[in-house]
Amino acid sequence: LGGMGGAQPLAITMNEGVCLAAEIEEWRIDKRIETRYLDQKFNDIDQAIDAALDAAQHKKVLSIGVVCNAVDLLQRLIDRNIIPHTLTDQTSAHDELSYVPANLTAQQANVLRQTDPETYRQLSLDTMAQHVKLMLELQKRGAITFDYGNNLRGQAKDKRGVQNAFDFPGFVPAYIRPLFCKGSGPFRFAALSGDPQDIYTCDQVLLDLFGHKPGLVRWLKMARERIAFQGLPARICWLEMGERQQAALAINELVRTGKVKALIVIGRDHLDTGSVASPNRETEAMLDGSDAVADW
Protein backbone atom coordinates (compact mmCIF):
# COMPACT_ATOMS: atom_id res chain seq x y z
CA LEU A 1 0.00 0.00 0.00
CA GLY A 2 2.76 2.40 -0.97
CA GLY A 3 2.73 5.21 -3.48
CA MET A 4 1.09 3.23 -6.28
CA GLY A 5 -0.47 0.24 -4.53
CA GLY A 6 -2.10 2.52 -1.98
CA ALA A 7 -4.56 3.71 -4.61
CA GLN A 8 -5.95 0.24 -5.28
CA PRO A 9 -8.26 -0.16 -2.25
CA LEU A 10 -10.08 3.04 -3.15
CA ALA A 11 -10.16 2.11 -6.83
CA ILE A 12 -11.85 -1.16 -5.91
CA THR A 13 -14.39 0.35 -3.53
CA MET A 14 -15.18 3.08 -6.06
CA ASN A 15 -16.17 0.20 -8.33
CA GLU A 16 -18.29 -1.33 -5.54
CA GLY A 17 -15.97 -4.23 -4.77
CA VAL A 18 -14.16 -5.71 -1.79
CA CYS A 19 -10.39 -5.29 -1.52
CA LEU A 20 -8.03 -7.40 0.56
CA ALA A 21 -4.48 -6.03 0.47
CA ALA A 22 -1.31 -7.22 2.18
CA GLU A 23 1.15 -4.62 3.53
CA ILE A 24 4.14 -5.55 5.67
CA GLU A 25 4.69 -2.00 6.97
CA GLU A 26 1.84 -1.18 9.35
CA TRP A 27 2.35 2.58 9.14
CA ARG A 28 1.45 2.48 5.46
CA ILE A 29 -1.91 0.93 6.29
CA ASP A 30 -2.50 3.58 8.96
CA LYS A 31 -1.66 6.32 6.45
CA ARG A 32 -4.12 4.96 3.89
CA ILE A 33 -6.87 4.82 6.50
CA GLU A 34 -6.07 8.39 7.57
CA THR A 35 -6.33 9.64 3.97
CA ARG A 36 -9.55 7.66 3.35
CA TYR A 37 -8.03 5.33 0.77
CA LEU A 38 -8.58 2.29 3.02
CA ASP A 39 -11.36 1.30 5.41
CA GLN A 40 -10.06 -1.30 7.88
CA LYS A 41 -6.87 -2.80 9.29
CA PHE A 42 -6.24 -6.33 10.55
CA ASN A 43 -3.14 -7.93 12.03
CA ASP A 44 -4.45 -11.48 11.65
CA ILE A 45 -4.64 -12.95 8.13
CA ASP A 46 -7.57 -15.28 8.77
CA GLN A 47 -9.61 -12.53 10.40
CA ALA A 48 -8.92 -10.28 7.40
CA ILE A 49 -9.96 -13.00 4.95
CA ASP A 50 -13.14 -13.71 6.94
CA ALA A 51 -14.04 -10.01 6.98
CA ALA A 52 -13.54 -9.78 3.22
CA LEU A 53 -15.67 -12.87 2.60
CA ASP A 54 -18.42 -11.54 4.85
CA ALA A 55 -18.44 -8.20 3.05
CA ALA A 56 -18.61 -9.90 -0.35
CA GLN A 57 -21.41 -12.22 0.78
CA HIS A 58 -23.48 -9.28 2.02
CA LYS A 59 -22.54 -7.11 -0.99
CA LYS A 60 -20.90 -4.56 1.26
CA VAL A 61 -18.29 -2.29 -0.31
CA LEU A 62 -15.14 -2.57 1.81
CA SER A 63 -11.35 -2.30 1.65
CA ILE A 64 -9.11 -4.15 4.11
CA GLY A 65 -5.40 -3.94 4.77
CA VAL A 66 -3.72 -6.81 6.61
CA VAL A 67 -0.28 -6.47 8.18
CA CYS A 68 1.65 -9.31 6.56
CA ASN A 69 3.87 -10.25 3.67
CA ALA A 70 2.00 -10.74 0.40
CA VAL A 71 3.21 -14.34 0.08
CA ASP A 72 1.73 -15.19 3.47
CA LEU A 73 -1.68 -13.88 2.44
CA LEU A 74 -1.57 -15.72 -0.90
CA GLN A 75 -0.49 -18.96 0.76
CA ARG A 76 -3.34 -18.73 3.25
CA LEU A 77 -5.87 -18.13 0.47
CA ILE A 78 -4.58 -21.26 -1.26
CA ASP A 79 -4.63 -23.27 1.98
CA ARG A 80 -8.27 -22.31 2.49
CA ASN A 81 -9.09 -22.68 -1.22
CA ILE A 82 -10.41 -19.13 -1.37
CA ILE A 83 -10.06 -17.78 -4.89
CA PRO A 84 -10.23 -14.00 -5.39
CA HIS A 85 -12.02 -12.79 -8.49
CA THR A 86 -9.03 -10.62 -9.40
CA LEU A 87 -5.41 -10.77 -8.28
CA THR A 88 -2.47 -8.45 -8.85
CA ASP A 89 0.62 -7.17 -7.07
CA GLN A 90 2.29 -3.81 -6.51
CA THR A 91 5.20 -4.65 -4.27
CA SER A 92 8.53 -2.97 -5.06
CA ALA A 93 9.76 -6.02 -6.96
CA HIS A 94 11.72 -3.85 -9.41
CA ASP A 95 14.16 -3.17 -6.55
CA GLU A 96 15.38 -6.13 -4.51
CA LEU A 97 16.28 -3.84 -1.58
CA SER A 98 12.80 -2.32 -1.40
CA TYR A 99 10.93 -5.61 -1.68
CA VAL A 100 10.54 -7.32 1.72
CA PRO A 101 11.54 -11.01 1.91
CA ALA A 102 9.32 -13.60 3.58
CA ASN A 103 9.84 -14.54 7.23
CA LEU A 104 11.06 -11.06 8.20
CA THR A 105 9.18 -8.33 10.00
CA ALA A 106 9.46 -4.85 8.56
CA GLN A 107 11.86 -3.96 11.36
CA GLN A 108 14.05 -7.02 10.75
CA ALA A 109 14.10 -6.23 7.05
CA ASN A 110 15.29 -2.69 7.75
CA VAL A 111 18.19 -3.99 9.83
CA LEU A 112 19.25 -6.67 7.32
CA ARG A 113 19.02 -4.20 4.45
CA GLN A 114 21.60 -2.02 6.20
CA THR A 115 23.90 -4.72 7.55
CA ASP A 116 23.96 -7.29 4.74
CA PRO A 117 22.41 -5.96 1.52
CA GLU A 118 23.60 -8.88 -0.65
CA THR A 119 21.94 -11.48 1.56
CA TYR A 120 18.86 -9.27 1.55
CA ARG A 121 18.81 -9.22 -2.27
CA GLN A 122 19.06 -13.00 -2.49
CA LEU A 123 16.26 -13.49 0.04
CA SER A 124 14.11 -11.01 -1.87
CA LEU A 125 14.61 -12.91 -5.11
CA ASP A 126 13.78 -16.21 -3.39
CA THR A 127 10.53 -14.69 -2.14
CA MET A 128 9.71 -13.20 -5.54
CA ALA A 129 9.93 -16.67 -7.08
CA GLN A 130 7.59 -18.01 -4.40
CA HIS A 131 5.32 -14.99 -4.90
CA VAL A 132 4.94 -15.61 -8.63
CA LYS A 133 4.32 -19.34 -8.13
CA LEU A 134 1.52 -18.56 -5.68
CA MET A 135 -0.05 -16.11 -8.13
CA LEU A 136 0.18 -18.73 -10.88
CA GLU A 137 -1.54 -21.27 -8.64
CA LEU A 138 -4.39 -18.87 -7.88
CA GLN A 139 -4.66 -18.08 -11.59
CA LYS A 140 -4.86 -21.82 -12.29
CA ARG A 141 -7.70 -22.04 -9.77
CA GLY A 142 -9.65 -19.27 -11.50
CA ALA A 143 -8.41 -15.87 -10.32
CA ILE A 144 -8.06 -13.25 -13.05
CA THR A 145 -4.38 -12.50 -12.52
CA PHE A 146 -2.21 -9.77 -14.01
CA ASP A 147 1.13 -8.04 -13.46
CA TYR A 148 0.84 -4.37 -12.50
CA GLY A 149 4.11 -3.12 -13.91
CA ASN A 150 6.57 -3.84 -11.09
CA ASN A 151 8.58 -6.50 -13.00
CA LEU A 152 7.82 -9.24 -10.48
CA ARG A 153 7.54 -11.76 -13.33
CA GLY A 154 10.82 -10.66 -14.89
CA GLN A 155 12.70 -10.99 -11.62
CA ALA A 156 11.29 -14.46 -10.95
CA LYS A 157 12.08 -15.72 -14.44
CA ASP A 158 15.45 -14.09 -15.08
CA LYS A 159 16.98 -14.48 -11.63
CA ARG A 160 15.24 -17.53 -10.18
CA GLY A 161 14.33 -19.57 -13.24
CA VAL A 162 10.54 -19.52 -12.95
CA GLN A 163 10.05 -20.30 -16.63
CA ASN A 164 6.27 -19.87 -16.68
CA ALA A 165 6.31 -16.55 -14.82
CA PHE A 166 4.79 -14.78 -17.83
CA ASP A 167 1.78 -17.08 -17.95
CA PHE A 168 -0.20 -14.21 -16.46
CA PRO A 169 -0.20 -11.04 -18.57
CA GLY A 170 0.91 -7.53 -17.84
CA PHE A 171 -1.82 -4.96 -17.34
CA VAL A 172 -0.95 -3.03 -20.51
CA PRO A 173 -1.64 -5.77 -23.08
CA ALA A 174 -4.48 -7.12 -20.94
CA TYR A 175 -6.38 -3.87 -20.42
CA ILE A 176 -4.67 -0.61 -21.40
CA ARG A 177 -3.45 -1.03 -24.98
CA PRO A 178 -6.94 -0.70 -26.51
CA LEU A 179 -7.03 2.77 -24.96
CA PHE A 180 -3.59 3.56 -26.34
CA CYS A 181 -4.78 2.48 -29.79
CA LYS A 182 -7.25 5.36 -29.88
CA GLY A 183 -4.81 7.87 -28.42
CA SER A 184 -6.28 7.81 -24.93
CA GLY A 185 -3.89 8.50 -22.10
CA PRO A 186 -3.57 10.15 -18.69
CA PHE A 187 -3.97 13.92 -18.47
CA ARG A 188 -3.21 15.54 -15.14
CA PHE A 189 -3.25 19.03 -13.70
CA ALA A 190 -2.37 20.67 -10.38
CA ALA A 191 -3.41 23.98 -8.80
CA LEU A 192 -0.42 26.13 -7.83
CA SER A 193 -2.70 28.23 -5.63
CA GLY A 194 -3.07 25.29 -3.27
CA ASP A 195 -6.83 25.92 -3.25
CA PRO A 196 -8.94 22.80 -3.95
CA GLN A 197 -11.63 25.04 -5.43
CA ASP A 198 -9.38 25.69 -8.44
CA ILE A 199 -9.41 21.96 -9.18
CA TYR A 200 -13.18 21.83 -8.76
CA THR A 201 -13.48 24.70 -11.23
CA CYS A 202 -11.37 22.76 -13.73
CA ASP A 203 -13.45 19.64 -13.07
CA GLN A 204 -16.59 21.54 -14.03
CA VAL A 205 -15.03 22.70 -17.29
CA LEU A 206 -14.18 19.09 -18.15
CA LEU A 207 -17.71 18.01 -17.28
CA ASP A 208 -19.06 20.71 -19.59
CA LEU A 209 -16.71 19.67 -22.41
CA PHE A 210 -17.02 15.93 -22.11
CA GLY A 211 -20.43 15.32 -20.57
CA HIS A 212 -21.03 12.73 -23.30
CA LYS A 213 -18.37 10.43 -21.79
CA PRO A 214 -20.10 8.53 -18.95
CA GLY A 215 -16.90 7.00 -17.57
CA LEU A 216 -15.20 10.37 -17.28
CA VAL A 217 -18.28 12.00 -15.75
CA ARG A 218 -18.56 9.23 -13.17
CA TRP A 219 -14.85 9.52 -12.32
CA LEU A 220 -14.83 13.30 -11.91
CA LYS A 221 -17.90 13.33 -9.69
CA MET A 222 -16.65 10.45 -7.56
CA ALA A 223 -13.13 11.86 -7.33
CA ARG A 224 -14.43 15.11 -5.85
CA GLU A 225 -16.32 13.20 -3.18
CA ARG A 226 -13.75 10.56 -2.30
CA ILE A 227 -10.19 11.53 -3.27
CA ALA A 228 -8.21 13.26 -0.53
CA PHE A 229 -5.67 15.70 -1.96
CA GLN A 230 -2.03 15.21 -0.97
CA GLY A 231 0.30 18.16 -1.44
CA LEU A 232 -0.97 20.53 -4.12
CA PRO A 233 -4.56 19.79 -5.16
CA ALA A 234 -4.44 17.81 -8.40
CA ARG A 235 -6.57 15.72 -10.71
CA ILE A 236 -5.94 13.05 -13.32
CA CYS A 237 -8.23 11.75 -16.03
CA TRP A 238 -7.91 9.87 -19.30
CA LEU A 239 -8.58 11.87 -22.46
CA GLU A 240 -8.18 10.96 -26.11
CA MET A 241 -6.12 12.59 -28.83
CA GLY A 242 -7.57 16.04 -29.48
CA GLU A 243 -9.51 16.05 -26.23
CA ARG A 244 -6.37 16.87 -24.25
CA GLN A 245 -5.89 19.96 -26.41
CA GLN A 246 -9.49 21.02 -25.81
CA ALA A 247 -9.10 20.58 -22.07
CA ALA A 248 -5.80 22.46 -21.94
CA LEU A 249 -7.17 25.42 -23.89
CA ALA A 250 -10.22 25.57 -21.62
CA ILE A 251 -8.04 25.49 -18.50
CA ASN A 252 -5.82 28.19 -20.01
CA GLU A 253 -8.92 30.33 -20.45
CA LEU A 254 -9.75 29.91 -16.76
CA VAL A 255 -6.30 31.27 -15.91
CA ARG A 256 -6.55 34.12 -18.43
CA THR A 257 -9.92 35.28 -17.13
CA GLY A 258 -9.03 34.93 -13.46
CA LYS A 259 -11.58 32.22 -12.73
CA VAL A 260 -8.86 30.29 -10.89
CA LYS A 261 -6.61 31.91 -8.30
CA ALA A 262 -3.23 30.98 -9.83
CA LEU A 263 -1.60 29.04 -12.64
CA ILE A 264 -2.63 25.45 -13.36
CA VAL A 265 0.23 23.09 -14.20
CA ILE A 266 -0.64 20.46 -16.81
CA GLY A 267 1.42 17.29 -17.04
CA ARG A 268 1.47 13.92 -18.74
CA ASP A 269 2.35 10.46 -17.50
CA HIS A 270 5.04 7.96 -18.51
CA LEU A 271 2.22 5.44 -19.00
CA ASP A 272 1.14 6.79 -22.35
CA THR A 273 0.72 5.99 -26.01
CA GLY A 274 4.19 7.20 -26.96
CA SER A 275 6.10 6.88 -23.75
CA VAL A 276 8.85 4.35 -23.09
CA ALA A 277 10.21 1.13 -24.52
CA SER A 278 9.65 -1.26 -21.62
CA PRO A 279 9.27 -4.89 -22.75
CA ASN A 280 7.67 -6.00 -19.48
CA ARG A 281 5.28 -3.08 -19.20
CA GLU A 282 4.29 -0.37 -21.74
CA THR A 283 5.50 -2.25 -24.82
CA GLU A 284 4.86 -5.81 -23.68
CA ALA A 285 3.54 -8.11 -26.43
CA MET A 286 3.54 -5.50 -29.18
CA LEU A 287 1.63 -6.82 -32.18
CA ASP A 288 4.57 -6.44 -34.55
CA GLY A 289 6.76 -8.46 -32.19
CA SER A 290 9.01 -5.48 -31.52
CA ASP A 291 8.58 -4.71 -27.85
CA ALA A 292 11.55 -2.33 -27.99
CA VAL A 293 9.54 0.20 -30.02
CA ALA A 294 8.16 2.99 -27.88
CA ASP A 295 5.22 3.92 -30.11
CA TRP A 296 3.29 2.54 -33.06
Question: Over which residues does each language-model region extend?
Answer:
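Glycine-rich, aromatic-lined ligand/substrate-binding cores of catalytic
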Residues: H131-V293
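Catalytic or ion-translocation cores adjacent to nucleophile or general acid/base/metal-coordination motifs
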Residues: G3-Q57, Q90-K133, P169-P178
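Generic beta-strand/beta-sheet core signal
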Residues: A22-E23, V67, D89-Q90, F146-Y148, ...
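Polyanion-binding loop/helix "lid" in catalytic or ligand-binding cores
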Residues: I64-V66, T127-Q130, E137
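Short coil/turn connectors at secondary-structure junctions
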Residues: N15-V18, H58-V61, I82-P84, K140-A143, ...
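Flexible loop/turn segments at secondary-structure boundaries
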Residues: G3-Q8, W27-K31, A70-L74, A93-L97, ...
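Active-site/ligand-binding-proximal alpha/beta "capping" segment
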Residues: S63-T91, S98
